């Protein structure tokens, strides 16, 4: 199912116009949507710019401009911050996910009756695409991009403790080598399951768990 969702997401992103070497900003907590979009972008040869979902509007503006992202994925709860900075950035397509997208029926109802009530409604907006709708759509099959190990795959950001955060450019080989290292260290094989709860917008969580 996971691989199927990645393929479906890649098809949807390609239909929206995301192409090789373009950037998509992923501003998500550790979640199915964030992880699926990460791999889908890589399948297309696009670059995932990973940012903290609790970033301020000013920080989001900075990150979108550094990465030159026309595309972004975030939760519906953070729509207003992206809308606020749209005109000052290259952003043209904002994909909104919802926490209940991957919850079971009972948990989804429970969320909508509690925490969900606190999330402001998103008004009609031509730049907004809903994750759930995209994943149900039908699109031409997107062919995997031909990528080299040294090609740019991800932009992560430094903490900015000594100044303005810097975009750290990571290649495909950075992740391949980290995967091999973790696999060897943990004696992992294709039958092993790992509970990954670290944040995907952080180097540790992205590099080790993803």
Locations of regions flagged by a protein language model:
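Conserved S/T- and glycine-rich ATP-binding loop of Class I adenylate-forming
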Residues: 24, 41, 72, 152, ...
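Hydrophobic alpha-helical segments in the ANL/AMP-binding
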Residues: 14, 32-51, 60-61, 182-184, ...
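Conserved AMP-binding/adenylate-forming core of the ANL superfamily
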Residues: 1-31, 35-39, 56-61, 172
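Conserved pre-ATP/AMP-binding loop-to-beta segment of ANL
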Residues: 119-157, 164, 187-193
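Conserved AMP-binding loop of ANL adenylate-forming enzymes
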Residues: 26, 150-153, 174, 186-210
């Amino acid at each position: 199912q996971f691989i199927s969702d990645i393929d479906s997401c890649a098809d949807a992103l390609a239909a929206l116009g995301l192409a090789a070497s373009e950037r998509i900003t992923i501003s998500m907590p550790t979640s199915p949507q964030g992880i699926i979009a990460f791999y889908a972008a890589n399948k297309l040869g696009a670059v995932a710019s990973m940012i903290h979902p609790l970033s301020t509007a000013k920080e989001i503006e900075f990150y979108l401009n550094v990465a030159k992202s026309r595309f972004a994925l975030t939760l519906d709860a953070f729509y207003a911050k992206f809308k606020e900075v749209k005109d000052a950035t290259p952003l043209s397509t904002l994909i909104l996910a919802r926490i209940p997208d991957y919850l079971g029926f009972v948990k989804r109802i429970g969320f909508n009756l509690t925490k969900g009530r606190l999330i402001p409604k998103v008004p009609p907006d031509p730049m907004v695409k809903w994750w759930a709708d995209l994943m149900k759509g039908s699109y031409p099959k997107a062919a995997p991009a031909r990528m080299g190990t040294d090609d740019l795959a991800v932009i992560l950001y430094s903490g900015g403790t000594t100044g303005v955060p810097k975009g750290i450019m990571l290649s495909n080989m950075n992740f391949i080598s980290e995967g091999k290292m973790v696999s060897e260290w943990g004696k992992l094989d294709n039958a092993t399951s790992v509970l990954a709860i670290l944040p995907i917008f952080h180097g540790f969580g992205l590099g080790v768990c993803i």
